[in-house]
Amino acid sequence: MALLSLVRFEFKEARFQLAISCIILISFAWLFIWLISLIKPGLWAAVLEFAPDFFQKLIAVSPAQLLTPRGQISVLYLHIVPLLVCMGWALGRGSQVVAGRIASGHMELLVASPLRRLELMIAPVVVIVTGAVLLGLALWLGTWIGLSTVRLSNPPEVFDFIPGAVNLTALTICLAGITTLISSLDQDRWRPIWGAMAVTIVAAIVKLIGQLLPGGGWVANLSFLTAFEPQKLILEPHASWNLPFFPHLAVELRFWFNLVLVFLGMITYAIACWIFVRRDLPVPR
C-alpha cells in the first residue's frame, strides 16, 4: 500500500513535465507533416542531389527512400525536437531518483518510511517507463493526426511509423537508466544530468566515427546509439542482422535494436538499485 502511494506521488510530481512533453510532441508531429505538405517533391530531390558524399554514410537508408512521403515523415523520429523532449524526460526523471531526492531533503523522509530501499527505486522506474511509452505514443499520435488532417500525395499508412516510435521509447528508457546509475553515485541533481549528456555525446561521436571510417562498423557497434535507427526501422521494417557466432540465425533489427536499448536501460537501473541499497546517504546541504 505504501509502495502504491509512492508511485502515485511520483506520477503527481512528474505529471506537468509529462503532459507538456506529450503536447509538444503531438503538436510538433502535426506541424512537421504540414510543413512537408508545403514542400514541392522536386525540392527534396535537389537537396539530396547536392548533398555531400559523406551524407549517404550518415543515413541508414538509401536516398531514394527519402523521396517518398513515408521517407520524408520518417525524419520526424530523428528530429532534434522529439529527441530533446525525450532526453529531457529521461535525464530529468533519472537524475531525480537518488541525487535529486538527496539534494531536496526528501530522501531522509523516504528512508525513514516503512519501505525498503529497493522499493524506493521501484516507484520511479514505473513512472519513467510509463512516461517513455506515453512519449513515443504521443509522437505517433501526432503523426496520425497529421496524416488524417493534412493532404499529402500518396500518404503512407500511420502504422508504418510504429517501429520508429517504439525505438524512440527504447532510447528514452536507456538514457533514463544511464542517468539513474550516475544519480545513484551522487547527491547533486545537476551532475548526473551533465554526466548523462556527456555519455550521450561520446556515444554519438563514436557512432559518427564508425559511420565515416572505412570498415569502421566495429567502432559504431561500441556505441549504444547504433541501436537507435528509427528511420531505418520505419522504411525497412523487416531488415535483419546475422548473429556473429550464429551466421545462419538472423534477427530482425526492429527487435534487436529495441532489445539492446531496453536491456541496457534495465541493467544500468539494476546496478543503480544495487549501489543505492548499499551506499551511505549524506546529509543534504
Predicted regions and their residues:
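Terminal transmembrane helical anchor/hairpin motif
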Residues: 6, 14, 31-71, 192-285
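Long, hydrophobic alpha-helical segments
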Residues: 73-100, 197
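Short alpha-helical transmembrane interface motifs in multi-pass membrane proteins
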Residues: 76, 88-91, 127, 131, ...
